[in-house]
């Protein structure tokens, strides 16, 4: 299979603009960059985003982790990753004004379109966030590019900031990751509301009594004649949907009781969108 060309040319940039890259919102947004466009350890979210209803293009582990936090936040209504700083001429002008070299493609030598990792709709505000390991903040070239980015967003009165690993609570993020793909659990419509409510009541009672999560789930599977693992998947679904609450600041370990378990509400929607 031929390798996909990752270098940028003027023709490629023009084509990306015509494709609508960096345009749209919510489910219809098209990121400027995908994991096929850049040499990275990028990944596509396994399931659709809770907030947007689409799969996201995340170019590093730290981007993925920050995405989980955003997707979990009830006050976030849109997440647009790899957002382009267009028009290109504007960032070129900023670079010239502050006396730094504009980012260029190392192979073709042409100026590339800069991007902000995340453009976020938070309540009634728009936030721009760059996500980078703290070690990169010591690189002068990186700082110069950040300054171009900062000035670009400042001219639009958009709050811009940098997120590093120190801003990312690991236990919370790993918990969100663990439940994330079960947000759209296909067992919910397949089993039907009667079975789901029975399972919810039975499992809730066991968890309230401090029973180990895995043991409680297995008992419910056996009692209701469900495939092994069904109740554990639905436990994750209820947490993802925030129907149930546990202490998300400590790692959820299925071989232990659920810490600070409580039922927030019983809004079970019989829908599935894949995972």
Residue ranges, per PLM feature:
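Electrostatic, structured charged patches in enzyme active sites and in nucleic-acid/phosphate-binding
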Residues: 1-275
């Amino acid at each position: 299979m031929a390798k996909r060309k990752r270098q940028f040319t003027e023709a490629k940039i023009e084509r990306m603009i015509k494709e609508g890259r960096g345009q749209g919102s919510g489910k219809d947004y098209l990121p400027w960059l995908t994991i096929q466009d850049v040499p990275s350890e990028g990944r596509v979210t396994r399931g659709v985003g809770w907030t947007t209803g689409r799969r996201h293009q995340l170019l590093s582990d730290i981007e993925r982790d920050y995405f989980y936090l955003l997707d979990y936040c009830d006050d976030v209504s849109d997440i647009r990753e790899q957002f382009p700083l267009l028009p290109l001429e504007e960032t070129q002008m900023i670079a010239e004004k502050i006396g730094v070299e504009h980012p260029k493609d190392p192979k073709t030598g042409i100026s590339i379109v800069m991007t902000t990792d995340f453009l976020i709709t938070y309540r009634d505000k728009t936030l721009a966030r760059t996500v980078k390991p703290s070690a990169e903040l010591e690189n002068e070239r990186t700082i110069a590019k950040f300054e171009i980015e900062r000035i670009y967003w400042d001219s639009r009165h958009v709050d811009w900031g940098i997120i590093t690993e120190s801003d990312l609570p690991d236990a919370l993020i790993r918990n969100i990751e663990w439940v994330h793909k079960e947000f759209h659990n296909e067992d919910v419509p397949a089993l039907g509301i009667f079975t789901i409510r029975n399972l919810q009541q039975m499992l809730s009672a066991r968890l309230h009594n401090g029973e180990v999560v895995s043991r409680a789930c297995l008992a419910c599977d056996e009692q209701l004649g469900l495939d092994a693992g069904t109740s554990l998947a639905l436990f994750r679904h209820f947490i993802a949907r925030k129907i149930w609450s546990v202490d998300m600041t400590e790692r959820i370990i299925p071989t232990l009781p659920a810490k600070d378990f409580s039922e927030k509400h019983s809004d079970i929607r019989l829908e599935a969108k894949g995972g």
